[in-house]
Design a protein with these regions (language model features):
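Catalytic cores and adjacent flexible loops of soluble metabolic enzymes
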Residues: 1-177
Length: 177
């Protein structure tokens, strides 16, 4: 719903947000998974943003002095998104193991936010060992639960993540926020 997106961008700007985040996927580019048969594929088809929708969102963000940010689910969509804005990209938790996507994102964007809700400590090492500019990487503590109750936020993990990489943040689905 583009009208709702426009309202959300305006509210994000009013609240002082730096970014307004969306999600980018093309259903035809999604890898196979449980969503093929559990009903989510129909939702993904309805919620897929067209190229024109993306361009409109970028323009609305600029108009409202907030930066456009999107989560990317497939390397095939990376080139298109980078033509709209090369400011930043977000790698969702379930793509944290996709080192090819992370590497390509670092080549095309100034900042790469990586949600690490599904990340094991060994995976942090693999990311940090990539031949990339680590100053572009921001690890975002995230608990992959929808919605998330406050007692499960686990903010101490944020401090643990900061011990291995100083640029950290929080990306959450906190109930009521």
């Amino acid at each position: 719903d583009m009208k709702l997106a426009e309202e959300m961008i305006a509210e994000a700007s009013k609240s002082g947000a730096d970014y307004c985040k969306f999600q980018t996927w093309k259903v035809k580019n999604l890898k196979d998974g449980p969503w093929n048969t559990d009903g989510r594929l129909e939702i993904y088809n309805k919620a897929e943003l067209s190229d024109q929708n993306h361009s409109t969102l970028v323009s609305l963000c600029k108009k409202n002095n907030v930066k456009f940010l999107t989560s990317i689910f497939n390397i095939n969509d990376l080139d298109f998104v980078s033509t709209l804005s090369n400011e930043a990209i977000k790698i969702p938790s379930h793509e944290v193991y996709n080192l090819e996507l992370i590497n390509a994102s670092c080549e095309k964007f100034k900042k790469v936010f990586i949600s690490v809700g599904a990340c094991k400590w060994e995976e942090f090492k693999k990311i940090l060992d990539l031949d990339i500019d680590l100053t572009k990487i921001y690890f975002m503590h995230c608990v992959s639960s929808y919605p998330l109750n406050v007692e499960n936020v686990n903010f101490p993990k944020l401090l643990e993540i900061k011990k291995i990489h100083n640029q950290v943040g929080y990306s959450g689905h906190l109930k009521g926020v």
